[in-house]
Protein backbone atom coordinates (compact mmCIF):
# COMPACT_ATOMS: atom_id res chain seq x y z
CA UNK A 1 0.00 0.00 0.00
CA UNK A 2 1.24 3.47 -0.87
CA UNK A 3 -0.27 6.50 0.89
CA UNK A 4 0.31 10.14 0.07
CA UNK A 5 0.82 12.89 2.60
CA UNK A 6 0.20 16.40 1.30
CA UNK A 7 3.53 18.21 1.53
CA UNK A 8 2.17 21.62 0.55
CA UNK A 9 2.46 23.05 4.08
CA UNK A 10 2.03 21.95 7.69
CA UNK A 11 3.21 19.03 9.81
CA UNK A 12 3.34 16.43 7.02
CA UNK A 13 6.60 14.91 8.27
CA UNK A 14 4.93 13.63 11.45
CA UNK A 15 2.19 11.87 9.45
CA UNK A 16 4.85 10.37 7.17
CA UNK A 17 6.76 8.97 10.15
CA UNK A 18 3.56 7.57 11.72
CA UNK A 19 2.54 5.81 8.50
CA UNK A 20 6.05 4.44 7.94
CA UNK A 21 5.95 3.00 11.49
CA UNK A 22 2.90 1.06 10.30
CA UNK A 23 4.89 -0.38 7.39
CA UNK A 24 3.27 1.79 4.73
CA UNK A 25 5.13 3.25 1.77
CA UNK A 26 4.64 7.04 1.84
CA UNK A 27 4.91 9.65 -0.89
CA UNK A 28 4.98 13.34 0.01
CA UNK A 29 2.55 14.78 -2.56
CA UNK A 30 3.21 18.24 -3.97
CA UNK A 31 2.05 17.88 -7.60
CA UNK A 32 -1.33 16.81 -9.02
CA UNK A 33 0.11 13.88 -11.00
CA UNK A 34 1.49 12.37 -7.76
CA UNK A 35 -2.10 11.72 -6.62
CA UNK A 36 -2.25 8.96 -9.25
CA UNK A 37 0.64 7.16 -7.53
CA UNK A 38 -1.09 6.74 -4.15
CA UNK A 39 -4.14 4.89 -2.82
CA UNK A 40 -5.14 7.55 -0.29
CA UNK A 41 -4.01 10.93 1.02
CA UNK A 42 -3.46 12.56 4.41
CA UNK A 43 -3.84 16.34 4.65
CA UNK A 44 -2.00 17.54 7.77
CA UNK A 45 -2.49 20.37 10.21
CA UNK A 46 -0.98 23.72 9.32
CA UNK A 47 -2.44 26.93 7.94
CA UNK A 48 -5.57 26.15 5.91
CA UNK A 49 -5.72 29.39 3.88
CA UNK A 50 -2.07 28.98 2.85
CA UNK A 51 -2.64 25.33 1.91
CA UNK A 52 -5.65 26.16 -0.29
CA UNK A 53 -3.81 29.02 -2.01
CA UNK A 54 -0.77 26.87 -2.80
CA UNK A 55 -2.92 23.89 -3.86
CA UNK A 56 -4.66 26.13 -6.38
CA UNK A 57 -1.34 27.59 -7.61
CA UNK A 58 0.10 24.13 -8.35
CA UNK A 59 -3.22 22.80 -9.80
CA UNK A 60 -3.61 20.25 -7.00
CA UNK A 61 -6.95 21.62 -5.69
CA UNK A 62 -9.24 20.60 -8.59
CA UNK A 63 -7.55 17.24 -9.20
CA UNK A 64 -7.81 16.34 -5.51
CA UNK A 65 -11.47 17.36 -5.30
CA UNK A 66 -12.30 15.35 -8.42
CA UNK A 67 -10.53 12.25 -7.04
CA UNK A 68 -12.21 12.50 -3.62
CA UNK A 69 -15.65 12.87 -5.20
CA UNK A 70 -15.01 9.65 -7.11
CA UNK A 71 -14.14 7.68 -3.94
CA UNK A 72 -10.46 8.42 -3.26
CA UNK A 73 -9.80 7.98 0.51
CA UNK A 74 -8.58 11.09 2.35
CA UNK A 75 -7.82 11.92 6.00
CA UNK A 76 -7.63 15.53 7.16
CA UNK A 77 -6.35 16.59 10.57
CA UNK A 78 -6.92 20.07 12.03
CA UNK A 79 -6.31 22.39 9.04
CA UNK A 80 -6.89 19.34 6.84
CA UNK A 81 -10.36 19.07 8.37
CA UNK A 82 -11.01 22.72 7.48
CA UNK A 83 -9.85 22.12 3.88
CA UNK A 84 -12.17 19.15 3.43
CA UNK A 85 -15.23 20.73 5.10
CA UNK A 86 -18.33 21.96 3.33
CA UNK A 87 -18.20 25.35 5.04
CA UNK A 88 -16.06 27.48 7.36
CA UNK A 89 -18.47 29.58 9.44
CA UNK A 90 -16.24 32.18 11.07
CA UNK A 91 -13.84 33.03 8.27
CA UNK A 92 -14.35 33.52 4.54
CA UNK A 93 -12.23 30.95 2.76
CA UNK A 94 -12.50 28.27 0.12
CA UNK A 95 -12.68 24.62 1.04
CA UNK A 96 -12.95 21.41 -0.96
CA UNK A 97 -16.49 20.77 0.32
CA UNK A 98 -16.14 16.97 0.29
CA UNK A 99 -17.51 16.21 3.77
CA UNK A 100 -20.84 17.59 4.96
CA UNK A 101 -19.60 19.48 8.01
CA UNK A 102 -19.46 23.13 9.02
CA UNK A 103 -16.42 24.13 11.05
CA UNK A 104 -15.27 27.06 13.12
CA UNK A 105 -11.54 27.79 12.85
CA UNK A 106 -9.40 28.01 16.02
CA UNK A 107 -12.49 27.31 18.16
CA UNK A 108 -10.49 25.82 21.02
CA UNK A 109 -8.30 28.90 21.39
CA UNK A 110 -4.91 30.13 20.31
CA UNK A 111 -1.57 28.30 20.36
CA UNK A 112 -1.12 28.97 24.09
CA UNK A 113 -4.50 27.31 24.74
CA UNK A 114 -3.36 23.97 23.29
CA UNK A 115 -4.21 20.93 25.39
CA UNK A 116 -4.31 17.14 25.59
CA UNK A 117 -7.22 15.05 26.83
CA UNK A 118 -8.39 11.44 26.80
CA UNK A 119 -11.34 10.76 24.49
CA UNK A 120 -13.40 7.72 23.61
CA UNK A 121 -13.41 6.68 19.95
CA UNK A 122 -16.02 4.35 18.49
CA UNK A 123 -14.51 0.90 17.96
CA UNK A 124 -11.41 1.52 20.12
CA UNK A 125 -11.12 -0.68 23.21
CA UNK A 126 -9.46 1.99 25.35
CA UNK A 127 -9.35 5.78 25.46
CA UNK A 128 -7.22 7.81 23.07
CA UNK A 129 -4.99 10.75 24.04
CA UNK A 130 -6.01 13.61 21.71
CA UNK A 131 -3.83 16.71 21.21
CA UNK A 132 -5.62 19.94 20.27
CA UNK A 133 -3.62 22.86 18.82
CA UNK A 134 -5.63 25.83 17.49
CA UNK A 135 -8.20 23.20 16.62
CA UNK A 136 -11.32 23.64 14.52
CA UNK A 137 -14.71 22.78 15.99
CA UNK A 138 -17.49 21.06 14.06
CA UNK A 139 -20.63 23.17 14.59
CA UNK A 140 -22.94 21.21 12.28
CA UNK A 141 -22.89 18.03 10.22
CA UNK A 142 -25.12 16.21 7.76
CA UNK A 143 -27.13 13.03 8.27
CA UNK A 144 -24.68 10.94 6.24
CA UNK A 145 -21.74 11.86 8.48
CA UNK A 146 -20.73 9.34 11.14
CA UNK A 147 -19.46 10.79 14.42
CA UNK A 148 -16.66 8.59 15.79
CA UNK A 149 -15.66 10.73 18.78
CA UNK A 150 -16.96 13.70 20.77
CA UNK A 151 -15.28 16.15 23.14
CA UNK A 152 -17.44 18.51 25.22
CA UNK A 153 -20.53 17.89 23.05
CA UNK A 154 -18.69 18.64 19.78
CA UNK A 155 -17.70 15.97 17.24
CA UNK A 156 -13.91 15.70 16.89
CA UNK A 157 -13.51 12.64 14.66
CA UNK A 158 -15.95 12.12 11.79
CA UNK A 159 -16.33 10.06 8.65
CA UNK A 160 -18.41 10.36 5.50
CA UNK A 161 -17.82 7.58 2.98
CA UNK A 162 -14.04 7.63 2.29
CA UNK A 163 -13.40 10.99 4.00
CA UNK A 164 -12.08 10.98 7.59
CA UNK A 165 -11.47 14.19 9.56
CA UNK A 166 -10.09 14.97 13.02
CA UNK A 167 -10.01 18.22 15.00
CA UNK A 168 -6.97 16.92 16.85
CA UNK A 169 -3.44 15.81 15.89
CA UNK A 170 -3.07 11.99 15.99
CA UNK A 171 0.33 12.27 14.31
CA UNK A 172 1.77 13.93 17.43
CA UNK A 173 1.12 10.90 19.64
CA UNK A 174 2.71 7.46 19.76
CA UNK A 175 -0.75 5.88 19.35
CA UNK A 176 -1.21 4.60 15.79
CA UNK A 177 -4.89 3.60 16.04
CA UNK A 178 -6.41 6.58 14.19
CA UNK A 179 -3.97 6.13 11.30
CA UNK A 180 -4.71 2.39 11.33
CA UNK A 181 -8.41 3.24 11.07
CA UNK A 182 -7.71 5.40 8.01
CA UNK A 183 -5.66 2.61 6.42
CA UNK A 184 -8.60 0.23 6.94
CA UNK A 185 -10.71 2.67 4.88
CA UNK A 186 -8.17 2.51 2.05
CA UNK A 187 -8.00 -1.30 1.82
From Swiss-Prot:
Keyword Membrane: no
Example of a GO MF term: glutaminase activity
UniProt entry tagged with the keyword Phosphoprotein: no
Active site (UniProt): 78, 169, 171
Pathway of action: Cofactor biosynthesis; pyridoxal 5'-phosphate biosynthesis
Alphabetical keyword list: Glutamine amidotransferase, Hydrolase, Lyase, Pyridoxal phosphate
SUPFAM superfamilies in UniProt: Class I glutamine amidotransferase-like
Annotated Gene Ontology cellular component terms: cytosol; glutaminase complex
Residues annotated for L-glutamine binding in this entry: 46-48, 105, 133-134
Enzyme Commission (EC) number: 4.3.3.6, 3.5.1.2
Top-level taxon of the source organism: Bacteria
Pfam families (UniProt xref): SNO
Catalysis performed (reactions): aldehydo-D-ribose 5-phosphate + D-glyceraldehyde 3-phosphate + L-glutamine = pyridoxal 5'-phosphate + L-glutamate + phosphate + 3 H2O + H(+); L-glutamine + H2O = L-glutamate + NH4(+)
Disulfide bond residue pairs: none
Gene Ontology biological process: glutamine catabolic process; pyridoxal phosphate biosynthetic process; pyridoxine metabolic process
Alphabetical list of NCBIfam families matching this protein: PLP_synth_Pdx2, PRK13526.1
HAMAP family in alphabetical order: PdxT (MF_01615)
Annotated family: Belongs to the glutaminase PdxT/SNO family.
Record's function text: Catalyzes the hydrolysis of glutamine to glutamate and ammonia as part of the biosynthesis of pyridoxal 5'-phosphate. The resulting ammonia molecule is channeled to the active site of PdxS.
Subunit record text: In the presence of PdxS, forms a dodecamer of heterodimers. Only shows activity in the heterodimer.
Name of the protein described by the UniProt record: Pyridoxal 5'-phosphate synthase subunit PdxT
Organism annotation: Thermosipho melanesiensis (strain DSM 12029 / CIP 104789 / BI429)
Name of the gene: pdxT
Amino acid sequence: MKIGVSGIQGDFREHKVMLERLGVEVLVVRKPEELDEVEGLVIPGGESTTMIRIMKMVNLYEKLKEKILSGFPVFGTCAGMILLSKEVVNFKQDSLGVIDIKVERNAYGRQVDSFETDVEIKGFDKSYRAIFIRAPKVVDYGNDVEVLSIYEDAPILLRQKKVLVASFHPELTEDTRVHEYFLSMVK
